[in-house]
């Protein structure tokens, strides 16, 4: 296979619900877990930050990756969708995964993952995990694809979870109210794992996150409580702390 043929193969694994609609939507993480078992759980070899929410996931993920890289860490970044090049989805210290690795992943492991009937998203995710492990990243920023609770990325055990905000998105899959959607997004909150919540929207949404965090003993921080202490200067591209003076 050349690179374009490899991409055609990967795209052909797009789940039926993407082509047909909600009627073909299958709940559960069985495929993701089975695929991860085949590869030996590579995401356990580095720290993870899981980023979910309705809007701003990509921006937050990229900002975090840049901050950590500037702090001296080797950083993996997994985001979706891509704009131009498939390889935008998988980066280490800002550099996209090379084409040869994408080809090698499919050719080398195809016989192993095809019996699982893994989707495009599951394969891409596992490719990222394996690549990050082989590149020996210190930490990986993992962006949720859709929802949270049943997203293929939700097999990881992150060191920090982030939920940017809640809006009415993918209502056929996540629910038709903000609280129902919040409950799906809250699915990435893990036991004992700190979670940062961005824009709350309303008290009912906030309560969904509070209840979920309490049920798994996860420390929870609402960023809106702290952001009032800061002011953004967009002209100078700076953020200032408002002191008592």
Feature map (PLM): residue ranges:
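Aromatic/hydrophobic pocket-lining residues that form π-stacking "cages" and hydrophobic walls in ligand
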Residues: 64, 128, 209
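Acidic, Mg2+-coordinating active-site environments of NTP-dependent enzymes
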Residues: 136-143, 160-245
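Short functional linear segments
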Residues: 1-52, 60-62, 66-71
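Catalytic cores of secreted/periplasmic lytic hydrolases that degrade extracellular macromolecules
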Residues: 57
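Conserved beta-strand scaffold positions in the cores of enzyme catalytic domains, especially
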Residues: 48-50, 75-77, 155, 161, ...
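Glycine- and other small-residue-rich loops at beta-strand/loop junctions that grip anionic moieties
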Residues: 53, 121, 197-199
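ATP-dependent carboxylate-amine ligase catalytic core
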Residues: 22-29, 34-45, 70-156, 172-174, ...
